[in-house]
């Protein structure tokens, strides 16, 4: 089966993102296809390159990045939600006159069209 995941919770502070990550790993282990993860609302904090968890905590931001690198899972973050929360790529940082960007490599600023496409092309869309 082909899946897409929607994450609406931040990397830390709620269970949503870590549950979504564990679900993503289980899908891959069981032989399903995970085509994309769409980060919306507070979920965009999962793409913040400046997140620095305690040394005894799992680094969820880098975990998502590894999922992208190892399995080719698209990591799309809602551009509108990201900009409102201070998550920008180099292009947006330049456009807004900001000194730097903080979008973790492997993540892509996307519109809701990416979520709509996933809804149309996947067998299941699961929201966390």
Swiss-Prot record:
* SUPFAM superfamilies documented for this protein: DsrEFH-like (SSF75169)
Provide the GO MF annotations for this entry.
sulfur carrier activity; sulfurtransferase activity
Q: Which UniProt keywords apply?
A: Cytoplasm, Transferase, tRNA processing
The UniProt entry's coiled-coil ranges are: none
- Report the EC number(s), separated by commas if there are several: 2.8.1.-
What are the GO BP annotations of this UniProt entry? tRNA wobble position uridine thiolation
Pfam families linked: DsrE (PF02635)
Location in the cell reads: Cytoplasm
Task: Spell out the catalytic residues.
Answer: 78
Sorted alphabetically, which Gene3D superfamilies does this protein's record hold? DsrEFH-like
What does the entry list under GO cellular component? sulfurtransferase complex
Instruction: Give the similarity note.
Output: Belongs to the DsrE/TusD family.
Q: How is the quaternary structure described?
A: Heterohexamer, formed by a dimer of trimers. The hexameric TusBCD complex contains 2 copies each of TusB, TusC and TusD. The TusBCD complex interacts with TusE.
Q: Which NCBIfam families match?
A: PRK00207.1 (NF001237), sulf_tusD_dsrE (TIGR03012)
Query: What role does it play?
Result: Part of a sulfur-relay system required for 2-thiolation of 5-methylaminomethyl-2-thiouridine (mnm(5)s(2)U) at tRNA wobble positions. Accepts sulfur from TusA and transfers it in turn to TusE.
User: Can you name this protein?
Assistant: Sulfurtransferase TusD
Q: What organism does the UniProt record list as the source?
A: Shigella boydii serotype 18 (strain CDC 3083-94 / BS512)
